[in-house]
Regions:
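Core catalytic lobe of class I
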Residues: 1-22, 28-279, 324-330
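PRPP-dependent phosphoribosyltransferase catalytic core
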Residues: 278-330
Length: 330
């Protein structure tokens, strides 16, 4: 029997009971039963599973491998190594990603400053490198002997020059600090709304609007490097279409699969840890009824700490729709 952690009453971190582990474990695929893999989680070693997956089976890959640092993933220890050794590790699986990806597909690979040189080098050996996204993590207290490590990178690459990318789906709604107007009093590039003054801006490769999952967020789990749903939503919306297949070879607690499901994509993922697989299955079940993504509403992404404005915008839209229905009925 697994001992449950004692948590504060308001802590919304997702956990598992022993009965839930038994139930969700029964839904997992194994390396020997991975043929029907669409919309499923495969529990096992990635290197055992990759040869059994068909070529050109996915449209988008999001890979968040163990970084080149010492880390404990629920007992699975990963040690830091030289840049050359880490590059060899990447070469052990990244070429297979090219085989699995469709000719019009894209791949995003996560890393930090230690792994930057190796990730870029090995990606360029196999794909067409398009960009590098840097996102602010906004977590941690820093150190006295060095600069606080406050960001991570995501490399964006494609199988060819013919790839999907929809920048209009990932616009960012920002508050207007200096509300300039043209001579007739017309707002210059911004809108006056009941919830404030906002401007829609094109996203850059520097993302400062992402919040790391924490105890008060229902998407939070005990996974040590869990990626935010908002981050995956940007990538999936920009680089895939409805019903496209999204693959995550290091699924962790399931964020990629959950967001793909919420956004109407198909998915599959591989994860070696039993506990994280079960958490991913539970999150997928909850995604049937909890379809919202924190920080994304009304078809746009919002800045951090704007939940009140988002809620007000939803109320305004709801009331406006109700008024329109009444007018139509009368």
């Amino acid at each position: 029997m697994t001992k449950l952690k004692i948590r504060a009453e308001r802590n919304r971190t997702m956990t598992l009971t022993d009965n839930e582990r038994y139930y969700y474990r029964s839904r997992l695929l194994s390396a020997d039963s991975a043929e029907q893999f669409i919309n499923r989680i495969i529990h096992g070693n990635l290197f055992d599973i990759l040869p059994k997956l068909p070529s050109a089976c996915c449209d988008l890959i999001f890979a968040d491998p163990p970084y080149n640092l010492a880390k404990d993933f629920n007992g699975q220890k990963f040690k830091s190594s030289s840049t050359e050794q880490y590059a060899d590790y990447l070469r052990s699986w990244l070429p297979e990603m090219k085989r699995l990806l469709k000719p019009t597909g894209s791949i995003y690979v996560c890393g930090d400053w230690r792994s930057a040189a190796a990730v870029q080098m090995v990606l360029e050996e196999n794909f067409l490198l398009q960009n590098r996204i840097t996102w602010e993590r906004e977590k941690g207290r820093g150190a006295k002997s060095n600069w606080k490590n406050n960001c991570e990178d995501i490399w964006f690459a494609t199988a060819s020059n013919n790839f999907v990318f929809h920048v209009e789906r990932v616009m960012l709604r920002r508050k207007v600090i200096a509300p300039y107007k043209d001579a007739p009093g017309v707002p210059r590039g911004w809108d006056e709304t009941e919830s404030g003054r906002f401007r829609l801006t094109y996203p850059s490769n520097l993302w400062t609007d992402i919040s790391i999952p924490f105890w008060s967020m229902p998407e939070n789990t005990d996974h040590p490097t869990q990626k935010p749903e908002k981050l995956l939503a940007k990538i999936i919306l920009a680089s895939s279409e409805k019903n496209d297949v999204v693959f995550d070879p290091f699924l962790g607690s399931g964020t990629t699969a959950v967001v793909a499901k919420k956004l109407g994509r198909q998915f599959f993922g591989v994860e070696i840890d039993d506990e994280y697989c079960c958490l991913a299955e539970k999150r997928l079940e909850f995604a049937d009824s909890q379809t919202n993504i924190q920080g994304y509403s009304d078809g746009v992404f919002w800045e951090r700490n704007t939940l009140a404005e988002q809620a007000n915008s939803k109320r305004i839209t709801h009331n406006k729709n109700q008024r329109q229905r009444v007018l139509l009925e009368t």
